[in-house]
């Protein structure tokens, strides 16, 4: 099914369950700095029931002039929604009401290095490690994770930056293989898969 939400530019979405149990889809709108909630009834998208507008800006006056949410998901051990925001250098957390209302968790925010431009956060299968892909500085931050507590344990460059310091490159995507033994990253500009 299809739902029209005029003027929206959704770049990523997730549901609050599998195809049998989900009753909501959560979408991030990159250009309008919003998170939208769409209801599902009998496995069909029905209508947009809620919006939440992010505010602020980041270090880079061009690429971070406003919030740019890029990824949405659920924490592995909580019923909290998380939104990765390239424009704010943050991962924000939300409580979701039965009616789809989103409430920003003002206590828990994962603040990243200014100007790094996070684009995606994924978890290993055990749910005890979080991997944040930073588009603007081409790094991956690895966190030990436990119930809304994130402890940075490693930051990795996604390509050898010393080889060509003038190269303009950005990290495009990260993904685990099927058993979590390898994390793959794609670089635009450096044009590499690592």
Where are the regions that the model predicts?
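Beta-propeller fold detector
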Residues: 1-2, 47-56, 103-110, 151-159
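A beta-strand-loop signature enriched in Asp, Gly, Thr, and Trp
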Residues: 142-194
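Beta-rich, blade/repeat-based domains predominating
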Residues: 3-24, 55-78, 112-127, 159-180
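Conserved beta-strand positions in repeat-built beta-propeller and related beta-rich domains
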Residues: 15, 22, 27-30, 75, ...
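Short loop/turn segments immediately following beta-strands, especially the blade-tip
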Residues: 37-47, 94-102, 143-151
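Loop-centered beta-sheet repeat module
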Residues: 81-138
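Structural signal for beta-propeller blades
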Residues: 32-36, 89-91, 138-140, 191-193
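Flexible glycine-/small-residue-enriched beta->alpha junction loops
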Residues: 28-60
């Amino acid at each position: 099914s299809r739902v029209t939400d005029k003027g929206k530019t959704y770049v990523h979405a997730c549901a609050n369950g599998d195809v049998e149990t989900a009753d909501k889809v959560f979408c991030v709108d990159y250009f309008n700095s919003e998170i939208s909630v769409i209801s599902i009834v009998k496995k069909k998208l029905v209508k947009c029931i809620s919006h939440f507008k992010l505010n602020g800006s980041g270090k880079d006056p061009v690429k971070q002039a406003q919030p740019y949410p890029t990824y949405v998901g659920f924490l592995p051990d909580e019923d909290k929604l998380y939104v990765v925001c390239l424009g704010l250098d943050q991962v924000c957390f939300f409580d979701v009401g039965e009616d789809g209302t989103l409430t920003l968790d003002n206590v828990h925010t994962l603040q990243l290095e200014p100007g790094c431009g996070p684009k995606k956060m994924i978890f290993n299968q055990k749910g005890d490690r979080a991997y944040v892909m930073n588009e603007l500085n081409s790094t991956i931050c690895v966190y030990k994770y436990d119930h809304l507590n994130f402890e940075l344990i490693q930051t990795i460059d996604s390509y050898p930056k010393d080889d060509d310091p003038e190269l303009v490159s950005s990290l495009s995507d990260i993904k685990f293989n099927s058993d979590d033994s390898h994390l793959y990253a794609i670089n635009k500009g450096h044009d590499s898969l690592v």
